[in-house]
Amino acid sequence: LEIAIGVVSAQTGDRITDSLAIEVSGDSTMSELIPYPNVRAFVNGLQSRELDFENPVASAEPVVSIISSFYNVRDYFEQTYQTVICQTFQNFEWIIVNDCSTDPEAIALFESLPERSAKIRTFHHDTNRGLAAGRNTAIQHARGRYLFFMDLDDLLDPTCIEKFVLFLETHPEFSFVSSYSVLFHDRELLWIHGFHEPAEFLDRNGVTGRILYRKADFDELGGFDEDLRFYEDWERWLKAIANNQIGWTIPEFLDCYRHKNKSGLLASAKQNVEEEQRVSELIRSRYRDAFETRKLSEIAPTRPDFDVRELRFQFDFENPLDRTNEGKRVLCFVPQMKVGGSDKFNLDLFGHLQQRGYDLTIAITISTQHDWYWQFHDITPDIFCLPNCLHDLHWLAFARYIIKSRQIDIVFLSNSYFAYYLLPFLQHEFPDVAFIDYTHTDDPGSYGIGYPRVSCQLAQFLDTQVVASQYLANYYQQLNPETQDKLRVCRINVDTQKWQRDFDKRQEIRDRLGISPDAIAILFPARIVPQKRPFLFVDIIAKLVERNLSVVAIILGSDYLYDDMQAKIDKLDLQSVFRILPSAAPDEVIEFYSASDILLLPSEYEGISLAIYEAMSVQVPVVAADVGGQAELVTPETGFLVPKGQGDAAEVEAYLNVLVPLVEDANLRDRVGKAARERVVRHFPLENMVDRMEEIFTEVRQLAQNNTPPDVNPVLAEESLIWFLEYFEFERRMASQWQKTQSWVNELQKHRDWLEQKYRQEGEQSRQWIQELQTQLERSRQWIEQLEASRNWFESQYQSWKETAQQRQEEIERSQQWNQELQTQLEQSRQWVEQLEASRNWFESQYQNWKQIAEQTRQELEQARDWSEQLQAGRDWFESQLHEWQNSARYHQGELEKTRAELERVQAMAKTERDRAEQLEAIITAMESSKFWQARSAWFKLKQRLGLEVED
């Protein structure tokens, strides 16, 4: 994993730049697709997006068997489950083997799986046997023609399995396929290695685990080595490569590998480094000879020869998705996803259709760098870059398959030549499906005026033809009058709520680009191609500079004329005037419009340029070529249109006649900008475009159901498609060869320039060297003359120096004597310094002792202060206790007095009782002695004492 490139910071989530784009194995027929601006955004999108691809019905004969081993899985399973169960390919079974889990919650989760989905089949191990054994057990029960290996904590793009299946179905020479991977969790990076680099596999595992393997080819070599507790997948891939099975890695990021530092395979390897090294060397030793005896080169899919049987190929399986959104299921064919007006229109349209409940599937037909892919992916993940998965001979089969799988209602073509040649087949086979195309402009330099020509030629197979301007609608009717009833005009419009001038960003961007406050910024947001006439733009700016006008040109764009344009700028010495930046995302482009004062677009041809819509919405005055339908948008009070000329001085002067007043008059710019925004807000808001397109979609659905399908000659249609494919392939190869030739020419040009520069430098250096030699010769002659004069002067001075020398000798002797005295004093001083040094050392040692004593004293004082505080606290406590004791003593004293009084009362009562007892005793004694009268007398005494009134 450490060898991966394209690292994205986990802390900052930095933007993935264009530098990450690579040429895929030297095969220009494929495109690398970057999913999102950073790893975290992509992963969050997979985890949070709600998808409706699931078909709950289990297949009796599944095409794919997903293989998973389950051991105490719990934490991340739900995320994995959702990305698997919501795949766009639903013809699968999911076999999960419980490798004797011990966690009760994990066991309960496992036992609930068959109830959650009819596609899941579960099996058990009685003992824990490891990941390899779990996979092997699952494979034994697999019924699919393909095996897909899935760990239960990773994530998948919704189209992952489907793209793998489509690839292997149309590339029988390959046994397995994977994709680029996104590493996330504890580490975030993009992994772009894979099976297209087989020679690298002996050094490291080039894939992160999720691959689709033909079951027949897998069974031929057997399962995973169950003796290996880790790296069992690496060992199995090496076995396949060593036995001449080949695989491919699709250059798209279709799976996410959870990189965990504290658990999992990586953690196990780190915790037991010696075992990891032993297993690694064991695996390498098994296949080192096979890799060394064979020279493995990078692999690339080969395009089959033109064969009508390939054209008639059809996928022999079904994949019906559970789609209920009838009437709103759209298959869109687009050529690319990059900076440009047509792609921005598609982005706006698809985004709003998705918000209105449409289900969109997008097919890309051109291999290039799709800079805006991730923005379309944010609208719908159901995107297929056809060159990455299929040969063009199989694109017709793909279209048939998708229409059936997604139950497509509408097929929408936007600037895709290839899709037009599929129309005769699709219109004939799917009469209930509506077919619409959308065209932005004519193109005089492409295929004979471009898309309008092919649209008009195949108009009978289109239910409706939508154009971006009335100008283009009129042009269609000239090409083919029969298109009149099918034509609809829908302008691309602009989101006026989003596209507003941002004054804070204006200053920020101008400061960043070094544009002074008084400079007028002129914006050129376009690809550097002949259509946009970048050289004419440079000429116009140069003339403005010649007139001493303070202007700065901002160019947003790039393409194959970039180097030539830069060379022209350098030749005119205008580097300080131009700010050239690469194409930006739509949200970022707004900032540059806000920073600009004028939009200048001297195009060769246009429909209605999207840049003009955007500039008018941001209140930037427009100066553009009067071509196409641009007069339908730009009126005299809202901008300036200049008649297209020959790109000569006269046309430059025509632009200057408009630009100079705008540059010099701020009030004019402000007035035109406000009027422009008012016009687009009133007549061209984006909502109007979406409403219009939805109205057309509804109308065309009804037309398709009522119209009679046109007659199709299958042989002629087939021949036309083959002709186009041959021409398309020839053009692709020529373009590739032209690029190589152009690259070679550029290299030769660089070498020629280097040689010329070297020759000029050498000539200049030789001339300078001769001049320097002549200068040095003249200096030498002058120096010799000076030496001669100096010799004469020295001879005349010799005698006087001799006398002076004698005097100096006497002075030296006196100096020596004085020096001896100084030496004596110096020795005394040295001894004194040594004494001072000893004293200093003694004082330093004493200082350290005093410092220690002071520190001890400070600590003792601290202790004394603490003890004093404790004593004070104790005294306060004793005083409070004494007060309590005094109160208690007073209380007990009172109680004691009460007790004493009570005691005296009790003693008195006791005395009384004793007297009573004595009287009773006397009575009893008298009665016993029959002394009745004594007893009676005693009785009466007792009665009187007691106060009794008792009769005898």
Give the residues covered by each predicted segment.
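A conserved mid-protein helix/loop that constitutes part of the nucleotide-sugar donor-binding site
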Residues: D75, D343-D348, I520-K543, D563
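Boundary detector for helix-to-coil junctions that initiate low-complexity/charged tails
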Residues: E2-V7, D18-N44, D289-R294, N706-D952
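Nucleotide-activated donor-binding/catalytic signature segment of Leloir-type glycosyltransferases, i.e.
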Residues: K119, T380-P387, Q566-A584
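Aromatic "clamp/platform" in nucleotide-sugar-dependent glycosyltransferases that forms part
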Residues: E604
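Acidic donor-binding segment of Leloir-type glycosyltransferases
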Residues: I85-F123
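Conserved donor NDP-sugar-binding/catalytic core segment of glycosyltransferases
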Residues: T159-L190
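Glycine-rich, basic loop-to-helix element that forms the pyrophosphate-binding segment
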Residues: H125-A142
